[in-house]
UniProtKB/Swiss-Prot annotation:
Keywords: Cytoplasm, DNA damage, DNA repair, Hydrolase. This is Uracil-DNA glycosylase. InterPro entries: UDG_fam1, Ura-DNA_Glyclase_AS, Uracil-DNA_glycosylase-like, Uracil-DNA_glycosylase-like_sf. It is found in: Cytoplasm. It comes from the Bacteria. CDD domains: UDG-F1-like. The active site is at D65 (proton acceptor). It is an enzyme of class 3 (hydrolase). Belongs to the uracil-DNA glycosylase (UDG) superfamily. UNG family. Its EC number is 3.2.2.27. GO terms for cellular component: cytoplasm. It holds the Pfam family UDG. Excises uracil residues from the DNA which can arise as a result of misincorporation of dUMP residues by DNA polymerase or due to deamination of cytosine.
Amino acid sequence: MNVRIDQSWKNKLDNEFEKEYFENLITYIKDEYSEHKCFPPGNEIFAAFDYSSFEDTKVVILGQDPYHGIGQANGLCFSVKDGVAFPPSLINIFKEIESDLNKPIPSTGNLERWANQGVLLLNATLSVRAHQAGSHQNKGWETFTDQVIRIVSETKENVVFLLWGGYAKKKTKLIDNSKHLILTSGHPSPLSANRGYWFGNKHFSKTNEYLKSQGEQPIEW
């Protein structure tokens, strides 16, 4: 499995890669990918760590599971490949950006443009079997991605963590809120958003205001 990962992230995560749980996880994932259709493609499993260096990371958005439909997942949470129809949660993300920042809804749901600016688009589980949501949960991915959050929290300062929905909010305990900004809201899925838990959170403008206050470039959402 030829994975892409920026060297700076590799340096930070090397200890984790050598742990027994991670070796067992990778053995399981290799078997899954050889025996079943899984997403994202093998070389994109670690894509979240390949667009910006660890040093340049200034925003973390936490998702739960990759999309499990054909051709959707590209290794970045909430993102889809160019030309793929927007999933409902992504539509609601773009609607919130539209109302918050007065930006038109883009023509593509590919969020590589965010990742290139230092937004870590991290799913808690980095792979999934086709058409079986949650099929790779509780196999070790969550241990790994929790450690990613801890490393960012402990070794960086002034990062914005966007935690949407109950699952993501549980990760608050991994983050030092004395040196980072944590913004929480309901999930952008229609079930949550249509009940008033998503729209109007203004997370995108709040993120940029905080980054500018720390002397950082704002994100071009």
